[in-house]
Amino acid sequence: MSNVDHAEIAKFEALAHRWWDRESEFKPLHDINPLRVNWIDERVSLAGKKVLDVGCGGGILSEAMAQRGATVTGIDMGEAPLAVAQLHQLESGVDVEYRQITAEALAEEMPEQFDVVTCLEMLEHVPDPSSVIRACYRMVKPGGQVFFSTINRNPKAYLLAIIGAEYILKMLPRGTHDFKKFIRPSELGAWSRVAGLEVKDIIGLTYNPLTKHYKLSNDVDVNYMIQTLREE
């Protein structure tokens, strides 16, 4: 059975035409993208690397990594977001290869092909996150690195990521996230280690509603990223 939640895909299909509108529902993704790309680039030096972006959506992260000199492939199961990504790269002149395929299917086709794999804000939208993590392990070269980001599962995350972001501040459409699908760092770390990935670093992303700014911090209570390594 395919590791795809069609209801989740439908959510993003409906919003795809606004993906590159920085004042739309995707504003948070645009705002945090420079922080995330810098954090990744500092750890792997993207220039000259072959990179896979799993769950690329409309291509915000994929384009940014390509602009840093990486050769980027972006994959997603949403047809409309991928169409938006392909159109936008015609405007921006950034070269990214986009494909509609699951991580598991691409892992069968392209094992150990990528220096870096990113899988950001995607794991909380699939039925079996551990399956995606195993696929990422298979696709990264020995000695390569895999980056994941998701949302912690605790009362604070429910309050800020769902009640705050979706209902009070209206930064995201209601129903964007399902609290039951949020992932604790301990769970993500355990799944990564079982897959064969060593957790190297973790960082939190926090939002100040007064200044409307995000920053990287040691607070991993809500949004967080991890860096993992496939040993040689």
UniProtKB/Swiss-Prot annotation:
SUPFAM superfamilies: S-adenosyl-L-methionine-dependent methyltransferases
Pathway given in the UniProt record: Cofactor biosynthesis; ubiquinone biosynthesis
InterPro entries: SAM-dependent_MTases_sf, UbiG_MeTrfase
Reaction(s) catalysed by this chain's protein: a 3-demethylubiquinol + S-adenosyl-L-methionine = a ubiquinol + S-adenosyl-L-homocysteine + H(+); a 3-(all-trans-polyprenyl)benzene-1,2-diol + S-adenosyl-L-methionine = a 2-methoxy-6-(all-trans-polyprenyl)phenol + S-adenosyl-L-homocysteine + H(+)
Protein's UniProt keywords contain Transferase: yes
GO molecular function ontology, one term from the record: 2-polyprenyl-6-hydroxyphenol methylase activity
Signal peptide bounds: none
Similarity field: Belongs to the methyltransferase superfamily. UbiG/COQ3 family.
UniProt protein name: Ubiquinone biosynthesis O-methyltransferase
Naturally occurring in which organism (per UniProt): Pseudomonas entomophila (strain L48)
High-level lineage: Bacteria, Pseudomonadati, Pseudomonadota, Gammaproteobacteria, Pseudomonadales
Recorded name of the encoding gene: ubiG
